C-alpha cells in the first residue's frame, strides 16, 4: 500500500511526498510506530529542499485522517542516515533494518521493514542530502515555519514528547537516542568508510556502482570498501557483474584467504555465515525488531549451531544498473539451463482458520507429525483476531501467540530460521527454511491486498511472500475470501483483485513490479470459503458419513468455478480424500449445531502452479479442535534450479567476451505503434486502458517516461503508464498500457472543468532522443466528486445538464444558501443520496454485515450510472453493493458533510451533546440536512441490530472518518483525538436528534 498518499493529503501547496515507509521509533525500552515521509519543496528560485516528516498513527495510513504529524527533521548539511547495530550483532534472514538518524544535536533510532520499499526510501533520502560544495547556499527551510507550534519561539528548545507538529531545526533541538557502532556506509553524501576490526560487511545484488571495489582486509577475515585503480576491464566487469547479478545467477566461490568465510561471487544465495566467534552475542532489547523474537528465543527456534545472517546490503541502496550489466544479466537468464540443474526440495504448506482463538494445543500434530523434516515451511492463518480493535487497527497480541506456537511446532529433527512474517488484520503468513538453506534465499518481498469494503478493511484479502530460492522464483499466497454460500461471485472477484493488485518491487528499479503470475512456482493456500451447493445439509452429512467424497466433490463451488475458468486457471489441486474442514462446534469433531447449522464444506484449500511439483500428501488434521475449522496441510517435492559453479563461471566469461566485441557508440532508436491516444466517455472509478508497442532497433536501450519541466510527475494524477520504464534488447518489443482512472482525488476538478482529459507524455531513451505522446478524451461528469450544495441545485440528472451549468454549480461557494438565488429552488438533500438511502431503507435494514462486506465492482458501476442518469427504476444490485456505493459517495465529497471549518469545534465538544448539536446547527443548510438525514437512517439500522448485528461503535467508526475530515494541509490528529471524532458521531446515534 502506498502510504505517501496519506502524507500528501497533510501537506501544503508546493510540498510533495516523494516516498514513505512504515517504521518503529526505538527509545530505550519504548517502541512507537512511526510513518516516515520524505517531503520535497520547490523554491521560487528553482532549487529544492527536503525534510523528513514523522507521523504517529495506529490505524492503517490510507488517508490523511489516519496520521498525525509528530516531528519534522530538515535534511540539512549535517543530516545523515546510517544503518547501525551493536558489535557482533546477528541478523535473521528477512529481519528489520535498524537505522540511526543524526543531525548536529539530534539522534533517533528506527527499525524499518525488510524489503524494497525501505531500499527505495533510503535511496531517495541519500539523493535528497545537500552536497558539500561551500559555494552552494545553505538550505534555509523557511517553508517549514508554518509547522512550528504557535506558542514556541524559534530560540526555545523543542520539548521532547510534544505531540504537536514540531520542526527540529539544526542547533535548536536536542532529542536523545542511542548511538551504536556503524555497520554500513553512512547515508548522505559521505564516502563509505572502512569498518572497525571485527565487523563484517555484506553485499549483494542491490549495491550501487560507485567506483568502490571489494578488497581483502589486511588483518583478519572480512572485506572493506575502498577506492582502487582499475586493473583490467575483464576482471572489473566480471566482478561488477557478479555483484549486481547475484540475484539472477552465478557461481559460489569460497574465499578462504586470511580465515575469511566470506562468500564471493554468489549467484543465488545472498547470506553470509557469521564467524563462529560471533555466536552468543545477543542483540540488545532496544534494537529488537517489533515482529522478531528475542535472540534466545530465535536461537531456540532455529536450533542452530551456526547463525545465518541475511544480505542486508541489497536493501540499503537502489541499484543503478548500467547498460552493459543489464545485457549480461539478460544473457545469463537466457542461458540459465546451461549452468543449472534441477534438485528436489521438500515444502510444507499449511492453512488454518483459527476463528479468533488463542493457541491451546501443540501444533506438531499439524506441522510435523508423520513427515520428514521439510526444507521450507509455508504456514498461513485466517481470522487470527476477530476483535473490533484488530479490525480497525494494526496491532494484535494474537500474532505473537501464534508465531510462538508455530515456531515450537516445527519439525524437531531440523534447525529452522524464520525468513518472513506478513499480516493483514487476521490474515497471517509465515515462511521458514532449514538453516542450511538460508544462504540461498534472496529477494524476499512481502505484500498485502485488502478486499474488504472500500479497500479499507483487511478482514478479507490476501498476503503473499515472494523469494528466490537458488535460481527459482517462488510466490506463496495466503488468502481469506468472502463468506456465505451465495457469494461465490464475490469470492471470484476477491481472487481476481488479489492477482491484479498484488505487486512486488524488483531490485532493478527499471523493471516493472512482479505479479503473482511472474513466478516459477506458486503455492496458494487459505480459507477460500467456497461451499457445497445444490445439496441440503443432511445429504451432505450422509455423503460424508459414507466417505463418498468423490460424489460430494462434484457439488464443490471451487471445482465448478475452476472448470468454468473463472478462477485459478492453470492451478492444480490434489484429490480431496478427507472430510470437509468446516464447520465444527469449537472443541469437538461435531458438525455445527448452532442456529444457523451451516452445511459442511471444504473451505480450506491448497493449490499450486508451476513445473517440477509433486504433491506427496494433502490432508486435514482432525486432532486439533481449537477452532470451528480444521487445519489442512500439503507436502510437496518441488524441483528447484541450482547453479553449477564451474559451468556458471564459463558461461559468464563467454558472455563478457562476446560483449567486448560490441560497439557501444550507436545511438538507440525505437519505433512506436501509436503516439496519439483518445479516451472516450471516461467514467468515475472505471479503468480505461489504451496500449501501444515500443519496437527497439539494433542497439539495447533503457526507456523511461520523464517529468516535464516544473512538474512533479511524468503524467497527470489520473493517468499511469505500465511499465513506466524498462530495458529493451535489440529487435525486441514491449507493450505499454496507458491506464486512466478517475478517483476522489481527481473527479472534482474534472466535473468543474478546471481539469480536462489532456496530457503530453515524454518517453525518453537513455543516450537517445525523446518521443512525445498526446493524450486526450472526455470525462462524463458524475455525482461522485460533486459538492453537496451543487447536487442540491441539480434537479435533473447530472448527465442531462450542459457542461457549463455543471461547472457553474460546482464552483459555487459551499456556504451558498437556499434563498435569494437566481437558480432554481434547490432540494433539501441531493437526490442521489436519497436514492441510495431509500433503497437501503426499503431492502437492507435487517441485512447482516451491512457496511462491512464489500459489494461487486460491476454492480457499483451500474449504481453509478443509474444515479448519474436518474434511471433509479433500473437499479438492481445487492444490498452490500449499494451500501458501499453510499460510503464511496460520502468519501468522494470535496467538502465533507461536516465542513472543514467546523472540524475542530466538533472535537472540542465531543463529550457535550448539547454543544455538539449547536455546532451542527452552524453548518450550511444543505450539509446540515444531509447530516440529520444520515443520522436518522443509521438510527433506523440500529433498531434492527438483532438482525443486522450493527452497533453504535461500528457505525461511528465507519462513518466518523467519512463525515469528519481534517482540512488538507493542517496538522493531523493523534489516536486520542480520533476517538473524539468517533465519540462525536456516537452521540447522535445514541441520543434523540
UniProtKB/Swiss-Prot annotation:
The UniProt record gives the binding positions of Mg(2+) as 355, 383
Q: Where in the cell is it found?
A: Cytoplasm, Cytosol; Endoplasmic reticulum-Golgi intermediate compartment; Early endosome membrane; Membrane
Record: residues binding substrate: 383, 459-460, 582-583, 596-598
Modifications the protein undergoes after translation, according to the UniProt entry: Isoprenylation at Cys-990 may be required for localization at the membrane. May be proteolytically cleaved after Lys-320 as inferred from N-terminal protein sequence of the 75 kda form.
Q: What is its main location?
A: cytoplasm
Give the site residues for Arginine finger. Answer: 852
SUPFAM superfamilies to which the protein is assigned, alphabetical: DNase I-like, GTPase activation domain, GAP
Residue ranges of the Rho-GAP domain? Answer: 821-993
The Gene Ontology CC terms held by the record are: cytoplasm; cytosol; early endosome membrane; endoplasmic reticulum-Golgi intermediate compartment; Golgi apparatus; membrane; neuron projection; phagocytic vesicle membrane
Q: Which CDD domains match?
A: INPP5c_INPP5B (cd09093), PH_OCRL2 (cd13383), RhoGAP_OCRL1 (cd04380)
InterPro entries, per this entry?
A: Endo/exonu/phosph_ase_sf (IPR036691), Ig-like_fold (IPR013783), INPP5B_PH_dom (IPR031896), IP5 (IPR046985), IPPc (IPR000300), OCRL-1_2_ASH (IPR048869), OCRL1/INPP5B_INPP5c (IPR037793), Rho_GTPase_activation_prot (IPR008936)
Q: In which tissues is it expressed?
A: Platelets.
Feature: compositional bias, Basic and acidic residues: 228-243
PH domain boundaries:
22-148
One molecular function GO term is: phosphatidylinositol-4,5-bisphosphate 5-phosphatase activity
- Covalently lipidated residues (S-farnesyl cysteine) read 990
Residues recorded as bearing Cysteine methyl ester in the entry: 990
**To which protein family does this belong?**
Belongs to the inositol 1,4,5-trisphosphate 5-phosphatase type II family.
Name of the protein this chain belongs to: Type II inositol 1,4,5-trisphosphate 5-phosphatase
Native species: Homo sapiens
Gene that codes for this?
INPP5B
Amino acid at each position: 500500500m502506498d502510504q505517501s498518499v496519506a502524507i500528501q493529503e497533510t501537506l501544503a501547496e508546493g510540498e510533495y511526498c516523494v516516498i514513505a515507509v512504515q517504521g518503529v521509533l526505538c527509545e530505550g525500552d519504548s517502541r512507537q510506530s512511526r510513518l516516515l515521509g520524505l517531503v520535497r519543496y520547490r523554491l521560487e528560485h528553482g532549487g529544492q529542499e527536503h525534510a523528513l516528516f514523522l507521523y504517529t498513527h495506529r490505524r492503517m495510513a490510507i488517508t490523511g485522517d489516519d496520521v498525525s504529524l509528530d516531528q519534522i527533521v530538515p535534511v540539512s548539511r549535517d543530516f545523515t542516515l546510517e544503518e547501525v547495530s551493536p558489535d557482533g550483532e546477528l541478523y535473521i534472514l528477512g529481519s528489520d533494518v535498524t537505522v540511526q538518524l543524526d543531525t548536529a544535536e539530534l539522534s533517533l533510532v528506527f527499525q524499518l521493514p525488510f524489503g524494497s520499499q525501505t531500499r527505495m526510501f533510503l535511496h531517495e533520502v541519500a539523493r535528497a542530502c545537500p552536497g558539500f560544495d561551500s559555494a552552494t547556499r545553505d538550505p534555509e527551510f523557511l517553508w517549514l515555519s508554518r509547522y512550528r507550534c504557535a506558542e514556541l519561539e524559534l530560540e526555545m528548545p523543542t520539548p521532547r514528547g510534544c505531540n504537536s507538529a514540531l520542526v527540529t531545526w539544526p542547533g535548536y533541538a536536542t532529542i536523545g537516542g542511542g548511538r551504536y557502532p556503524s555497520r554500513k556506509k553512512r547515508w548522505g553524501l559521505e564516502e563509505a568508510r572502512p569498518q572497525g576490526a571485527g565487523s563484517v560487511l555484506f553485499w549483494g545484488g542491490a549495491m550501487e556502482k560507485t567506483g568502490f571495489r571489494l578488497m581483502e582486509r589486511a588483518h583478519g577475515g572480512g572485506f572493506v570498501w575502498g577506492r582502487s585503480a582499475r586493473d583490467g576491464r575483464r576482471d572489473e566487469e566480471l566482478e561488477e557483474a557478479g555483484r549486481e547479478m547475484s540475484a539472477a545467477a552465478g557461481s559460489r566461490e569460497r574465499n578462504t584467504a586470511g580465515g575469511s568465510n566470506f562468500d564471493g561471487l554468489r549467484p543465488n544465495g545472498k547470506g553470509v555465515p557469521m564467524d563462529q566467534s560471533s555466536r552468543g552475542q545477543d542483540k540488545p532489547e532496544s534494537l529488537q525488531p517489533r515482529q522478531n523474537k528475542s535472540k534466545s528465543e530465535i536461537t531456540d527456534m532455529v536450533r542452530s549451531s551456526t547463525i545465518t545472517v541475511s544480505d542486508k546490503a541489497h536493501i540499503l541502496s537502489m541499484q543503478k544498473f548500467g547498460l552493459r550489466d543489464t545485457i549480461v544479466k539478460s544473457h545469463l537468464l537466457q542461458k540459465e539451463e546451461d549452468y543449472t540443474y534441477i534438485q528436489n526440495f521438500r515444502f510444507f504448506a499449511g492453512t488454518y482458520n483459527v476463528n479468533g482463538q488463542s493457541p491451546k494445543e501443540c501444533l506438531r500434530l499439524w506441522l510435523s507429525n508423520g513427515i520428514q523434516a521439510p526444507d521450507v515451511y509455508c504456514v498461513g492463518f485466517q481470522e487470527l483476531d476477530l476483535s473490533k480493535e484488530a479490525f480497525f487497527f494494526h496491532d494484535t497480541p494474537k500474532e505473537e501467540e501464534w508465531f510462538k506456537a508455530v515456531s515450537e511446532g516445527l519439525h524437531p529433527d531440523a534447525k529452522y530460521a524464520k525468513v518472513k512474517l506478513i499480516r493483514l488484520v487476521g490474515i497471517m503468513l509465515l515462511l521458514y527454511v532449514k538453516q542450511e538453506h538460508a544462504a540461498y534465499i534472496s529477494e524476499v518481498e512481502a505484500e498485502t491486498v485488502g478486499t474488504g469494503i472500500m479497500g479499507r478493511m483487511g478482514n478479507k484479502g490476501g498476503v503473499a511472500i515472494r523469494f528466490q530460492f537458488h535460481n527459482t522464483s517462488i510466490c506463496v499466497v495466503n488468502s481469506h475470501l468472502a463468506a456465505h454460500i451465495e457469494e461465490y461471485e464475490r469470492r471470484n472477484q476477491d481472487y481476481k483483485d488479489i492477482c491484479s493488485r498484488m505487486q512486488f518491487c524488483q531490485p532493478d528499479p527499471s523493471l516493472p513490479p512482479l505479479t503473482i503470475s511472474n513466478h516459477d512456482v506458486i503455492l496458494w493456500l487459505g480459507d477460500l470459503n467456497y461451499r457445497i451447493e445444490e445439496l441440503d445439509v443432511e445429504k451432505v452429512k450422509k455423503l460424508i458419513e459414507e466417505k463418498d467424497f468423490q460424489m460430494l466433490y462434484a457439488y464443490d463451488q471451487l471445482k465448478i468455478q475452476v472448470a468454468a475458468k473463472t478462477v485459478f486457471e492453470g492451478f492444480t489441486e490434489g484429490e480431496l480424500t478427507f472430510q470437509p474442514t468446516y464447520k465444527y462446534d469449537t472443541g469437538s469433531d461435531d458438525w455445527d449445531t448452532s442456529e444457523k447449522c451451516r452445511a459442511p464444506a471444504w473451505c480450506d484449500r491448497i493449490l499450486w502452479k508451476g513445473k517440477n511439483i509433486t504433491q506427496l500428501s494433502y490432508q486435514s488434521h482432525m486432532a486439533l479442535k481449537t477452532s470451528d475449522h480444521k487445519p489442512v496441510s500439503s507436502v510437496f517435492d518441488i524441483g528447484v534450479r541450482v547453479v553449477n559453479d564451474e559451468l556458471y563461471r564459463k558461461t559468464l566469461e563467454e558472455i563478457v567476451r562476446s560483449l567486448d566485441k560490441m560497439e557501444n557508440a550507436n545511438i538507440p532508436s525505437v519505433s512506436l505503434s501509436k503516439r496519439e491516444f483518445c479516451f472516450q466517455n471516461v467514467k468515475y472509478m472505471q479503468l480505461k486502458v489504451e496500449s501501444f508497442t515500443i519496437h527497439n532497433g539494433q542497439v539495447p536501450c533503457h526507456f523511461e517516461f520523464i517529468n516535464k519541466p516544473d512538474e512533479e510527475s511524468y503524467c497527470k494524477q489520473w493517468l499511469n503508464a505500465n511499465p513506466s520504464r524498462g530495458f529493451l534488447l535489440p529487435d525486441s518489443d514491449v507493450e505499454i498500457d496507458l491506464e486512466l482512472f478517475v478517483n476522489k482525488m481527481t473527479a472534482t476538478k474534472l466535473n468543474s472543468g478546471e481539469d480536462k482529459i489532456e496530457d503530453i507524455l515524454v518517453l525518453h531513451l537513455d543516450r537517445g532522443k525523446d518521443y512525445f505522446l498526446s493524450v486526450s478524451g472526455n470525462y462524463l461528469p458524475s455525482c461522485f466528486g460533486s459538492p453537496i450544495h451543487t447536487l442540491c441545485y441539480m434537479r435533473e440528472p447530472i448527465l442531462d445538464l450542459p457542461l457549463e451549468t455543471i461547472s457553474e454549480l460546482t464552483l459555487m461557494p459551499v456556504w451558498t444558501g437556499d434563498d435569494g438565488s437566481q437558480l432554481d429552488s434547490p432540494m433539501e438533500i441531493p437526490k442521489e443520496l436519497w436514492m441510495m438511502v431509500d433503497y437501503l431503507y426499503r431492502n437492507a435494514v435487517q441485512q447482516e454485515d451491512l457496511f462491512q462486506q464489500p459489494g461487486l465492482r460491476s454492480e457499483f458501476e451500474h449504481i453509478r450510472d443509474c444515479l448519474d442518469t436518474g434511471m433509479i427504476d433500473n437499479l438492481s444490485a445487492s444490498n452490500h453493493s449499494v451500501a458501499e456505493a453510499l460510503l464511496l459517495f460520502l468519501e468522494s465529497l470535496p467538502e465533507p458533510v461536516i465542513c472543514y471549518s467546523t472540524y475542530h469545534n466538533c472535537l472540542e465538544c465531543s463529550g457535550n451533546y448539547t454543544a455538539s448539536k449547536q455546532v451542527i446547527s452552524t453548518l450550511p443548510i444543505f450539509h446540515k440536512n444531509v447530516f440529520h438525514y444520515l443520522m436518522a437512517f443509521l438510527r433506523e439500522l440500529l433498531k434492527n441490530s438483532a438482525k443486522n448485528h450493527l452497533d453504535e461503535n461500528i457505525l461511528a467508526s465507519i462513518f466518523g472518518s467519512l463525515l469528519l475530515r481534517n482540512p488538507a494541509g493542517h496538522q493531523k490528529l493523534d489516536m486520542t483525538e480520533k476517538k473524539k471524532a468517533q465519540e462525536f458521531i456516537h452521540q447522535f446515534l445514541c441520543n434523540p436528534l
